[in-house]
Structure formats: structure tokens, C-alpha cells
Amino acid sequence: MKLRWRFGLAAALFLAVFSLYPQMKLWYERGAEWQGNYAYNDIDEVAYASYVKALIDGRPRKNDPYTGRDNSPETPQKESLFSIQFAAPYTLAIPARVLGIPATWMMTIGGALAAA
């Protein structure tokens, strides 16, 4: 049985580009006034982007994007919905920190990669 990788790669590329449509439409509609915003598909992505930004900024894994509190010896934080899902946020945060990419761009890029 011969695998047809080209079809799979073409489908992945199509889905990645298609997932960028909301962001491209935002850029088109707002033009130079887009102010660094990004289009999101789910209501919890705002808090998730805040958590990723905190990791990019070097804050600890156990931080709360809703209250802004960080884990410290004086105020230890419990595990949260965000801190237990550390693989995906760090997959976005580490390259962003190294390359100097803002969280809004990483959320857009991450969405395209997830769609592919």
C-alpha cells in the first residue's frame, strides 16, 4: 500500500491557511488600526493567551491569569486548570521568549499549527 503524503500535506496546509482567515479578516477590516489584537474562536482563549503571555514574561507556571497572582513561598498557589496543562503553553512560550514574539502572534501561529 502506497502512502500519499502529498495529499495529507496539502490538506494540512489548506487547514492551516483556512484557520488564519479570521485573523486575516481582522487585519483587512482594521488595517493599521488593528492594535495587536488577534481573532479567537473560543471564549477561554483570552485567559489562555494571558497565561501564555505570563510564561513568555518569565512568570512561574503556577500563576493565575484572572487575578495576576504568582506562586511564591509567601503566597503559594494551588494547581489550576492552566498550570496542569503545561506542555502546550510552554510549546508556545519558549519559542516566543527566545525569538521575541508577542503572545498574540503565538496564539495565531499556534492555532494554525493545531489546525494542520
Where are these regions (language model features)?
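Active-site lumenal/periplasmic loops and adjacent helix-entry segments of GT-C-fold
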Residues: V17-A116
